[in-house]
Every structure is written in structure tokens, then in C-alpha cells.
């Protein structure tokens, strides 16, 4: 069974993954699901936002200033009852692509990494809690990213 997700901006993902962009996002998610040994198929929303929208989200939910690459909002059980809906991921491609240029890497390489990072946050991998959590989160993020890059060439 496939996970259920919705994407608000298919044009960007068509450029990234080609005509079958949903298969690309599904591939990312299935590799993460396999890596985490999940036995269920959660639902999530993937939203592409502008820098101005991301600034507002960053201030509203994280109490931080400025734009950022990815924000994940987890639904907690009291909000949704028993549900497979786990949350929403907001990506800001303009910020991600600017950052990619600054560090000298491929736009799509960094976008994939941010997508993985966002999905891991939905599973409560929180690198900001402690150094140990950061090590575990980055280990999973690197391993999953490497596996995706070995399967999906861009």
C-alpha cells in the first residue's frame, strides 16, 4: 500500500522528478518508511511556499525570524483523533536554491535533502533536542539521502 500525500505545487515536482513526480516523492517516502521499519502508511501534505509565507510560518510556529528551507508541523493525536495523518511539510524552493548556490551543490540534491529532513521531523526526529538526537537524525538523513541518490538520478 502506498502512503497518501498531497502536493500543492506539482509544477516544481514535475521539473524535479519528471512527469511521474508523485512516484519520486513516493520513492523518498517509501525509502524513509523502510529505513524506519514503519508498519503503517501515514498521510501527509507537502506544501511549496514563497519566502514571505515561510517567514510568517517560521515566526508563527517556531518563533524565529526570517525565511528557512523546511518547516514540518506534526499533527498530535488530540487534534486529529486516531488518524494516519501525521502532518504537513512546507518547503521554500527559492530559499533552498539560493542556499544550494551558496554552498555549491545541485538544487535538486538540496531539495531532496530538505524533503527527507521534513519527513523525518514528522516522525519526531528532532535534532534540536540534544546532541544525541542531532547525531541520530543526521545519520538517518544521510543514509536515506544516499539511498535515494543511488536510485533516482537527476
Swiss-Prot record:
What happens when the protein's gene is inactivated? Probably essential, it was not disrupted in a global transposon mutagenesis study.
- Top-level taxon of origin: Bacteria
Q: Name one GO molecular function term.
A: zinc ion binding
Write down the required cofactor(s).
Answer: Zn(2+)
- A Pfam family: YbeY
- Top enzyme category: hydrolase
Gene Ontology CC: cytoplasm
Q: Name the InterPro entries for this protein.
A: MetalPrtase_cat_dom_sf_prd, YbeY
**Which residues are recorded as binding Zn(2+)?**
117, 121, 127
Give me any GO biological process, just one.
rRNA processing
Purpose:
Single strand-specific metallo-endoribonuclease involved in late-stage 70S ribosome quality control and in maturation of the 3' terminus of the 16S rRNA.
Protein known as: Endoribonuclease YbeY
* Originating organism: Mycoplasma genitalium (strain ATCC 33530 / DSM 19775 / NCTC 10195 / G37)
Q: Which gene encodes it?
A: ybeY
